[in-house]
A protein has these predicted regions:
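PDZ-domain C-terminal substructure recognizer with occasional recognition of PDZ-binding tails
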Residues: 92, 219-226, 254, 260-263, ...
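N-terminal activation segment of mature serine protease catalytic domains
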Residues: 1-59, 65-70, 78, 125-130, ...
Length: 301
């Protein structure tokens, strides 16, 4: 299972150097695992995300608890972790939290690597040096810096008040570890982005989900498999921004938007009578109306 991970590497000049780190780099990198999952053909996310997914996961507890990005394990029936020495480790999904995007899996056999300690993403600043670490040791570790910290809204009805944007981009970003120079975990890799600095300069980088979002919900995730916060209403409408307008780019099969006969190309003018011109404003207004099941009036053009 590990062979294909050895076919590429970060150029040595872009790999982190031990002398620049206040921790044992090789030990920390051994705690980042490859993650592979299999999803049933009839799963809700199968058509968009596929039935076979691959990325990374980060060991955060000595008992084998691994943190990853949720889209890798959403609806997964089978999960495998692969260590840097090629050992395949069976695992199962513990939790997936749509609000943050985090996923948790539990290794089903003992792992020998030490967990990576959690850091404080709130204290990190633009310009700080960081390491983006995928499975595979130094060959798959990238020296980078924080390009920006700002709001992020995703068309799949996802919103972070403050995401971390790093550059350059790691080629295997999904579930990768974002480490500070003390070896602490600042976040988990989520997306490839082309506009990541404060001035929206065309720079390739990654969006990272900050680790600070995990602690408030970790107990719930371990006990219930999801956060116990009220669930946001879901529209099943994939909205996008263009030329100062917010429009419908797609609708989920069988979702509320499709059932309400909302069409691709419709322009969203207002939510519950309040004008909205960007995706973040639309989501915040929608969620302010109540929890899942609430009626959401939309004004469309």
């Amino acid at each position: 299972m590990a062979g294909d991970y050895q076919e590429w590497q970060i150029p040595p000049a872009n790999q982190p150097k031990q002398e620049d780190c206040a921790f044992d780099l090789s030990v920390a990198l051994a705690s980042v695992f490859a993650l592979r999952s299999e999803i049933p053909d009839d799963a809700f996310t199968a058509q968009v995300l596929g039935t076979e997914r691959a990325g990374n996961g980060v060991l955060i507890r000595a008992d084998g608890l691994v943190l990853t990005i949720g889209y890798l394990v959403a609806e997964a029936e089978t999960v495998w972790l692969v260590s840097n020495d090629g050992a395949a480790i069976p695992a199962h999904v513990v939790a997936y939290d749509h609000h943050t995007g985090f996923g948790l899996v539990q290794a089903l056999v003992k792992v020998s690597s030490p967990p990576i300690p959690l850091g404080n993403a709130q204290m990190a600043e633009a310009g700080d040096p960081v390491i983006i670490a995928g499975h595979g040791g130094m060959r798959h570790a990238l020296s980078a810096s924080i390009a920006a910290k700002r709001e992020f809204a995703g068309y799949w009805e996802y919103l972070l008040d403050e995401a971390i944007f790093v550059a350059p981009a790691h080629p295997n970003w999904g579930g990768a570890a974002l480490l500070d120079r003390d070896g602490k975990l600042l976040g988990i890799g989520s997306l490839f982005m082309q506009q990541v600095d404060e001035n929206d300069t065309q720079t390739e980088g990654n969006m990272i989900v900050p680790i600070d979002l995990l602690n408030p919900i970790l107990d719930d995730l371990l006990k219930f498999g999801k956060s116990q916060h009220p669930q946001h209403p879901w529209l099943g409408a994939y909205a996008a921004e263009s030329n100062g307008q917010l429009f419908i780019a797609g609708v989920a099969d069988g979702g509320p938007a499709e059932n309400a006969d909302i069409q691709v190309g419709d322009v969203i003018l207002a939510v519950a009578g309040e004008s909205v011109s960007d995706l973040a404003a639309m989501l915040r207004k929608t969620w302010s109306l109540g929890s899942a099941g609430v009626e959401v009036p939309l004004t469309l053009l």
